[in-house]
Amino acid sequence: MSVIIALAALALLMLAAYRGYSVILFAPIAALGAVLLTDPSAVAPAFTGVFMEKMVGFIKLYFPVFLLGAVFGKLIELSGFSRSIVAAAIRLLGTRQAMLVIVLVCALLTYGGVSLFVVVFAVYPFAAEMFRQSNIPKRLIPATIALGAFSFTMDALPGTPQIQNIIPSTFFNTTAWAAPWLGVIGTIFVFCAGMLFLQRQRNKAQKAGEGYGTELRNEPETAEDIQLPNPWIALSPLLMVGIMNLLFTHWIPLWYGKTHSLALPGMTAPVTTEIAKLTAIWAVQAALLIGILMVLAFGFSAIRSKLAEGSKSAVSGALLAAMNTASEYGFGAVIASLPGFLVLADWLKSIPNPLVNEAITVTLLAGITGSASGGMSIALAAMSESFISAAHAANIPLEVLHRVAAMASGGMDTLPHNGAVITLLAVTGLTHREAYKDIFCITLIKTLAVFVVIATFYATGIV
């Protein structure tokens, strides 16, 4: 019964998200409904002590990233930089390659360490402009961005600095470059299968006479009265964000050390911060600030008259995206604390093959919690020792465990209630009903990829 309660809460939230209801409202309703059916006396403590703690903790850490990312994306749009880059890309590659260009831009940014949430805000203006000029249905933008930002550069490509590739290293004593050949094989599979799927969907739409669409929501502004800047100037803030993010990731620990104690005259006690936990967040915030300043410096004349309204729009978008994701994060924390979740975790331990066991466990928990990093953290915290023991018994290198766990986390995490999916749809002005089925197909490709990697390892022994 406890398992049914947990799954029912998940089903309710997924249904609410798919039908367009606010996740900010339904995440606590679904989570606390499950608590009510489990232990009515625990509803209030679970809401305050688990749901709100996790939700507020997420906002505390990540809202500045959402805000700066939204402002950066809006300025890229208002300055005409997005149109300039799109025009150059179309001249270079032609309109037939619009989806490939967007996938590669997303991949470049995420592999450079830019948060996938930031990529959504920053790339959407480019994608909308390119899809409009190429007359590709707007509903395919989310799946295209998802392929570039939420898949192979998130957890498969060796060396990626995304958190999904870092978490396994703390459990298996590996590095971000673990099992490089398996990672490359997984990357090639996801990229090729994903592009084939997107191209197939585009061809089907073209045959049906479906174009970009009309009367759409949240469309980037397309001012016709501005002179388009040089595409290299337009591209420079985007490149600068990736480069500075990488540099700040190395500089911040050198400046502050492992911990930093802040003691200002008005403080009753010093505040000690563990720098390692905040390095990635501080780095991307600093990089985005520099990117914003670059856009303002190069495009202020075009932006000036629209800056007030544009900044309001960006702040509104950031608030909605952050609250959606934080509410989902709180939901996952509550569900993970229920008896049904523990029963499910224990059942998963019974799967005999260590790599298949790990892959199924991580991807299922990522799906239930709606978070790749959250599901993987829960799975590895509870079961990493058993995975390691089984791997040693089967002579499987721990590097393979790392790569399988990372890739599995990015499989079923993108179900309808996933925070990144909700953010992506909110930013693009689309609904689950309009665009989610294409995202789900990318999810299936990504889920299948980890089993392709496992089969490759057993067939060849390559690592």
Where on the chain are the PLM-derived regions?
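Hydrophobic core segments of alpha-helical transmembrane domains in multi-pass membrane transport
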Residues: I5-A17, P28-L37, F66-V71, V105-T110, ...
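Long, contiguous bundles of hydrophobic transmembrane helices that form the permeation core
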Residues: A6, T38, W181-G310, V427-T428, ...
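Short helix-coil transition sites and intra-membrane helix breaks within transmembrane domains
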Residues: R19-V23, I59-Y62, G73-R83, L109-A122, ...
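Core transmembrane alpha-helical segments of multi-pass membrane transporters/permeases
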Residues: L25-P28, T48-R83, L108, I275-G340
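Hydrophobic alpha-helical transmembrane segments of multi-pass integral membrane proteins
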Residues: F63-G69, L92-E129, A322-G330, I351-S389
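Re-entrant/interfacial helical elements at transmembrane boundaries that shape
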Residues: A70, S84-V86, F117-M130, G159-F171, ...
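Interfacial loop-to-transmembrane junctions
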Residues: A89, L93, L424-I445
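Alpha-helical transmembrane segments of multi-pass membrane proteins
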Residues: R96-L109, I136-T153, A179-I188, P354-I368, ...
